[in-house]
């Protein structure tokens, strides 16, 4: 949506508020709480996930940080998939979503939530090493945030097609027009043109992998 994109740009330009992850605590959260937060604060909304963690503020340490009354308690959410056993016997999890509350940059937030997930999974499902993989949207990021967390590049994914109303509004993954009943009404002539929609492509994504317990 327009307001979300504008808030993301403001944060990228250093115009948003800051919250320090050291002033927050990590808690597991439920499906509904994660979905509500991600629908409001992630460009692609929520996604199916098995593990969901939230970052909750409990204090502010002053200069350079948003006041406690200027943000809600839940300021960031990370969601991870169910583990999948690889051919070598290790488990692989996907980091499906990460988002901070609109207009706020959480300094150290990605690392705090990732560490919580890794600690939660260590020694479970499959003993020994496991991996966390994710995709970086090249429209917004170049992967450096993930590299700082220890992720390594593992290839590129081609651009993805979306349908978008010409008068604005949220873009819809092209595949959802046929697979998601919420959007089937847009398919009047098989292309979405009946609803004045245009086909656009993003710039693709970068695959990254973090190897844990090695």
Q: Where in this protein do the model-derived segments appear?
A:
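C-terminal "cap" of GNAT-fold acetyltransferases
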Residues: 164-193, 197-214
